[in-house]
C-alpha cells in the first residue's frame, strides 16, 4: 500500500479539505462518521487515504492545522483529535506570512510529532499532500515552515501541493499578498515535488460558467477544487494498470525538477442539484474541451510561444480505449497541442475505473493536468506585483517584527525569477542544455 498523508493548513486549506473528504467518503461508500455504508467490493484502496481504528471506523490520514478555530471546529468527528492543531492564541495570522511562519517555528514540533505519528501508522507512506493558500498568513507562512520541516524529516517522500493562488488580475483586500506569495513560492519551489496551481479568479469564473448561477459561493468553489483533487487521485484510490502511484504520475508530469508547476482543467463540472440533467459527451468532446482556456483553473492565455512540457488526462466513463488513441493521434496530427521542441510529445491518458458511488451528469468526464511554459506568466504577474511593493519598501515593518528581514524577500524574488526564467528557457529547442 502506498499511503498518502494530507496536511490541511489555514482557513483555505481546511475548507478545501472538508469538501475533499466529503467527496472521498462518497466515492468509497463511507459515512461522514467513518462507518462503512457500502459493503460491495468497489475495487478501491480505502487504506491509501484512510485507516481503520479499533472500532472499525475509517479515519482520514490527515493533519489539520489552523491558528483560529472557525473552520477547524466544524471538522467531522471521524478526524482523529490527536491530529488537529489549533493555536492557543486563537487570533489567526492576520494575512501576514511572517506571523504564520513565526508561529510555525515556535510550535512546529507539535505538528511534526503529529505527522510522525501518522507516518508511523502507514505500511509504506509515499506522499504528503499540502492543501493551502499562498496569499494569506497561516496557509502560506505556517505551510512554508511545514514544507521545510517535512523535507528535512522525510527527504525521500513525495511532497505534492494543491496551492490556491490569489486573484492577480484584480485588486485585493490583502495588500501584502504579493509578499506572502513570493515568500511561499520560495519554499514551494525548494521543498515540493509537484505544485498543482489553481487561482481564485479562474475558479470563480469557471464555477459561474459551469453552474450558470448568479454568484458562486465558497461552497461551490470548494466543490470544484475537491472534484479536481478527487479526480487527480482516482487512479491511486481505484487503481488500474497505470498511474496508480503518485511517483508514476509525478514522473509523467515533472520530467525535470525545475519545471514543477501543474495546472488542472476539468469538464463537465456540476453541483448536486444539476446531476439529474444528463448530457451527451464523448471521449473526443471531453478531451477537446480540456484544451480550451475556459476550463483551465489557473488563468493564463496560451500563445504560440508557450508550449506544453507534459500533459496527463484522466478520463472516466470511456469504454473504448481505441477511441482515446484515435483522439490523441488526431489532436497531434492537427497540431492542437503545442509541445516543447526538446522532447517527444508527452500526451498521456489514464482511463479511470468506473466509481460506483459517483454521480456524473454525462457518460464521460475528464481532468487534464498540464505542465506548461505558460506557468511563467503566472509567476511573472506575482513577481511584477511584488516589485511594485518592494520598490516602495512598503509594509516591510509588519514583517520585520516577526523576524522577516528584507533579505528574505529578495531571496524569495530571486528563486521565483529563476523558476520563471527556467520556463522561458524550456520553450527553446536547446533546453535543457541551454
UniProtKB/Swiss-Prot annotation:
First-listed, main subcellular location of the protein, grouped into a coarse class: cytoplasm
InterPro entries: Gamma_tubulin, Tub_FtsZ_C, Tubulin, Tubulin/FtsZ-like_C, Tubulin/FtsZ_2-layer-sand-dom, Tubulin/FtsZ_GTPase_sf, Tubulin_C, Tubulin_CS
Entry keyword Nucleotidyltransferase: no
GO biological process assignments: cytoplasmic microtubule organization; microtubule nucleation
Gene3D superfamilies: Helix hairpin bin (1.10.287.600), Tubulin/FtsZ, C-terminal domain (3.30.1330.20), Tubulin/FtsZ, GTPase domain (3.40.50.1440)
Gene Ontology CC: one annotated term: gamma-tubulin complex
GO molecular function: GTP binding
Compartment list: Cytoplasm, Cytoskeleton, Microtubule organizing center, Spindle pole body
Residues engaged in binding GTP: 135-141
Family: Belongs to the tubulin family.
PANTHER family per record: TUBULIN
Function: Tubulin is the major constituent of microtubules. The gamma chain is found at microtubule organizing centers (MTOC) such as the spindle poles or the centrosome, suggesting that it is involved in the minus-end nucleation of microtubule assembly.
The protein's name: Tubulin gamma chain
Natural source organism: Encephalitozoon cuniculi (strain GB-M1) (Microsporidian parasite)
